[in-house]
Amino acid sequence: MTVTIYDVAREARVSMATVSRVVNGNQNVKAETKNKVNEVIKRLNYRPNAVARGLASKKTTTVGVIIPDISNIYYSQLARGLEDIATMYKYHSIISNSDNDPEKEKEIFNNLLSKQVDGIIFLGGTITEEMKELINQSSVPVVVSGTNGKDAHIASVNIDFTEAAKEITGELIEKGAKSFALVGGEHSKKAQEDVLEGLTEVLNKNGLQLGDTLNCSGAESYKEGVKAFAKMKGNLPDAILCISDEEAIGIMHSAMDAGIKVPEELQIISFNNTRLVEMVRPQLSSVIQPLYDIGAVGMRLLTKYMNDEKIEEPNVVLPHRIEYRGTTK
């Protein structure tokens, strides 16, 4: 049987308001009374309901986390950083999987608000215009972390995809690449646009043109990478930039199955740098996003908003670096 605040109050022979003050750390309670209430709480194994506590403190110490695909290793690495900081600041998280579905995402967002969470954080994916409106109207702070879609009005944490693309393109041109393709998906549309901006800028400066820009129909998966290679097979570029590691590995394996040498005949680089990049042979060259830090800094930024701390910069850009491994020359 569930123990309630009423049971604790009755056993300790105090009012429910007194129990609530003890639970919420209110100092306006005599030490003797506080000790008696805490003894009863321990003996009855009472677990205060977060929402019930929130009625007194106006805080539930819970945050809502919206993830596009919880099974994707990219998002799990973001979530790890977030969880560690949430625990450090004594917040509990309610993690919800949106399945990359904008309608489900809206439903989850409103459901989290109804649960009286203190804040909401988006991990990865793309923020739609409709979602931006909901965020701007939200009654609680919202942070987007590792999420595609720059918006000066929404607090965010990410890397600069455009600058990363410029660096990569310049390096690959120096290594002899003259033709390029870009592979991404609908769920990373904004990141793809940012990469495309940097890629085309450097190509134009060098008098080169972009070949294929392929949008995968679904999530950025291994299978979609295989499909992308099949579309390009008759007219392969010298280098392919992939938004996700899984797409890049799908392309690499397809190329090798077709007898194409990587990186001698085809160079491949990705923008995720999940653990997968070192599990394949040759190891995958990639932009190193500090995934753990993106999740951790996003959560810390949210705690600042929730606790009315001073915000130095609402749009945090973390440094990236590029690791050239076995899929580039």
From Swiss-Prot:
Signal peptide: none annotated. The keyword Signal does not apply. InterPro entries: CcpA, HTH_LacI, LacI/GalR-like_sensor, Lambda_DNA-bd_dom_sf, Peripla_BP_I. The keyword NADP does not apply. It holds the Pfam family LacI. Keywords: Activator, DNA-binding, Repressor, Transcription, Transcription regulation. Residues 5-24 bind DNA. One of its GO terms (molecular function) is transcription cis-regulatory region binding. Residues 1-57 form the HTH lacI-type domain. It comes from the Bacteria. Global transcriptional regulator of carbon catabolite repression (CCR) and carbon catabolite activation (CCA), which ensures optimal energy usage under diverse conditions. NCBIfam families: ccpA (TIGR01481). PANTHER family: ARABINOSE METABOLISM TRANSCRIPTIONAL REPRESSOR, LACI-RELATED TRANSCRIPTIONAL REPRESSOR. This is Catabolite control protein A. It comes from Staphylococcus aureus (strain N315).
